[in-house]
Amino acid sequence: MIKAFAALEAKKGLEVFEFEAQPLKPNEVQIKVESCGICHSDLSAIDNSWGASKFPMVAGHEVIGKVIGIGSKVSLHKIGNRVGLGWHCGYCNSCEHCNLGDHNFCGSTKKTVFSQHGGFAEEVSADEVSVIPIPEGVKLEDAGPLLCGGITVFTPIVEFDINSSHKVGIIGIGGLGHLAIQFYKALGCHVTAFTNSNDKNDLLTSLGADEIVSSTDSLSIKALGAQFDFLISTVNVKLDWNLFLNTVKPRGRLHFVGAVLDPIAVSVFSLMGGRRSISGSPVGSPKNITKMLNFCAEHKVSPMVEHFSFSDINIAINKLRANKVRFRAVLTW
């Protein structure tokens, strides 16, 4: 039996839960979980905020561990390898998107949390393609959040060819934003951080922010003018998007990685007049996760993490709910 922590019903604390391991399919890998990050998406799964949860719900999709079993057709991994597993645990591996390496666009993706029991467990299984080797130079104990939060803010770098000539603005400096600062600064970009917290300035400067602007000070934001080549929003709250859009240069882009539930109201004239673009993206493909991890190893990018024992999982979750974690929570067995 595999020990796990599960929500037995929505919006309740997690309890010890045991389930039987299923036989590995030919293309699957069995991972002994050593640590697992807690993401706000896990809270959404536990609370059934999206209406897709099935109970008992074993969440967790920022897994770091060791390969302890491989299916008969597995060729990408060996027993003992240190690996990570993120939001997706499987793909069809035969559609147009998978064949192009864009597995995250596959119409038959399997979710680590919703398609099976996730990483808040002693073991988890996944399609070998979704299991990512962890390179030397990446701190294993802190790496879990890179598999979701990290790739979420790294993917636009690849998709839009962000480089050192670009001025970048980052809206929201939390679990996603603090990683975004590090990534974009490591590229050589001029980075402006937008935050509603007055107590983070020294920290944001140490992470690489060149300028810090209050995200609630409309006059200061307006005074920036149209200066950003790329403006990325990591928040899930409603803001004055026209105000922020007007800080984007002609041909620039406002990109969303935070899941704002309210409709985004923007002026079409602001888009047309400057040929500005609005876009969004979630997580990323296995190839881009690998690229991101290598980038982290080279540039010493690492999440700021608070560590908790799995036995304290409810303490960690409640602290995350209260927005008191700086900046990511990671559970270890």
What residues fall within each predicted segment?
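Rossmann-fold NAD(P)-binding glycine/threonine-rich loop
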Residues: 259-274, 286-292
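Glycine-centered, small-residue-biased loops immediately flanking beta-strands
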Residues: 252
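Adenosine-nucleotide cofactor-binding segment
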Residues: 164-173, 185-241
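Helix-to-beta-strand junctions that scaffold the AdoMet/dcAdoMet cofactor pocket
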Residues: 248-249
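NAD(P)H dinucleotide-binding glycine-rich loop of Rossmann-like/cofactor-binding domains
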Residues: 91-171
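N-terminal Rossmann-fold NAD(P) dinucleotide-binding loop
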Residues: 177-178
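C-terminal hydrophobic helical "lid"/dimerization subdomain
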Residues: 2, 286-333
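Glycine-rich beta-strand-centered segment in the early N-terminal region that forms part
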Residues: 22-36, 49-96, 130, 135-138
